[in-house]
Amino acid sequence: MIKWNKEIVIPANIETVWKLFDIEQIQRIMPYVIEHKPLDIKEGVVGSTYLQTYQEGKRKETYTVTDLEYENTNLKKHKKIEFILAKAFRIQTSFTLMKEEDKITKFIYSGQNEGINFLGKSLLKLGGTKNNNKVVNDFVNLVLNEAMKSSS
């Protein structure tokens, strides 16, 4: 299992950053997600499911994303999701925004990637944390850059 937790400070309003996680905006911060459509939206968000399609090169994967946690207040925004990728990995990620000042937001991206069968466990050992760290850093930097574009 690989775990991560990355924190950065974004010089933008919390609402500006949070909008990047809307269904209509998600491709700005997740460019490999080519489709994200609601399947079952629950009141209060938790338990809602979405069909998401990810494409990198010629490889295309479609999977169901479930909202596990959700909070949306003036000072804190939080969403935790889970999905099974390629029948080999159970991935949980959480996105937390904390309002530091009017135009200063702390962004915490954390999660875990667990191999759920022999193939998944083997691939995680081969890929290691170095590749995962690059993916995490790239994502956090993309959120930062897109938030900066939106706030200017």
Predicted region positions:
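Hydrophobic ligand-binding cavity/cleft-lining segments
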Residues: M1-V45
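Hydrophobic-ligand-binding modules of eukaryotic lipid transfer/binding families
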Residues: M1-V9, E100, N137, N141, ...
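Short, surface-exposed coil-to-beta transition loops
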Residues: K3-N5, K60-V65, F89-S94
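Residue-level recognition of well-ordered beta-strand positions that form the cores
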Residues: E7-V9, L51-T53, L68, S94-M98, ...
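Short strand-connecting beta-turns/loops that link adjacent beta-strands
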Residues: N13, N72-T73, E100-I104
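Short, amphipathic alpha-helical "lid/cap" segments that border enzyme active or binding sites
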Residues: I14, N133-V140
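Glycine-rich portal/gate segments that line the openings of hydrophobic small-molecule binding cavities
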Residues: P38-A86, D138-S152
